Amino acid sequence: MKKTSDYAVAVIGLGSMGFGAAASCINAGLTTYGVDINPQALEKLRQAGAAQADTRIDAFADKLDAVVLLVVNATQVNGILFGEPQVAAKLKPGTVVMVSSTISAQDAKNIEQRLAEHQLVMLDAPVSGGAAKAAAGDMTVMASGSDLAFEKLKPVLDAVAGKVYRIGEEIGLGATVKIIHQLLAGVHIAAGAEAMALAARADIPLDIMYDVVTNAAGNSWMFENRMRHVVDGDYTPKSAVDIFVKDLGLVTDTAKSLHFPLPLASTAFNMFTAASNAGFGKEDDSAVIKIFNGITLPEKKEAP
């Protein structure tokens, strides 16, 4: 195994999770590169100590031991690897590609097959934990792939993860575990929004309702994290409504392929879809509460 400073990794996709993962790689002493179309994110990563940050991987592709993809969906993963940027064709044979986007199991398998044509190794490795845990190097990784892929990515996994779950060798297992996790995450947000909407309708102050739930048995991590945004009237997106339209769509597609009923997930999917259709798709996912009529929600307090 190389010394950490000799190990080079590029993180593609410097959103809240990707930026945190890249910063954690820098903090762990890895030679870290960043790729994104956002110039502010690139400059911020340079300031954090990246070896280089650019809109394309061309200048440093041949230096890399690993690539981490933290983009929105399978379309973006395929476009980056095999589309116009042709990232896969520019990497050295044997480079390991960690695909951490939330995608279907079939998409993961298809991507792995195409990477193998370029003699590249894939780890199917979705992540969870949010921006704060990404920045702290404490994400949860649910991964499947070969022993070789895990071995090649050990410096990266050590840098970005608090927990790494090895689901098995078959590509697609990691993707499926993440999809099932997203079922719970989406249902928790939708249920939390419904409860807070009922409280608003009943003229219960939402800050009091929030305080009661977060100190009682009905609490969940998603309620505590997302319903705080409702109380604050701040729908600046940490994760957008449209992300859960996508993720719960993957949940329902997975269930359909298995002929398996998901009544709660289907309802949550419809709630997020309604919120997106009403114009809230780019807002924080807690904005799903805005589908309820006849209630008054807190407004964001402007800083003095």
From Swiss-Prot:
Transmembrane segments: none annotated. GO terms for molecular function: NAD binding; NADP binding; oxidoreductase activity, acting on the CH-OH group of donors, NAD or NADP as acceptor. One of its GO terms (biological process) is organic acid catabolic process. The active site is at 178. The keyword Oxidoreductase applies. Disulfide bonds: none annotated. Catalyzes oxidation of L-threonate to 2-oxo-tetronate. Can use either NAD(+) or NADP(+) as cosubstrate, with a preference for NAD(+). This is L-threonate dehydrogenase. The lineage of its organism: Bacteria, Pseudomonadati, Pseudomonadota, Gammaproteobacteria, Enterobacterales.
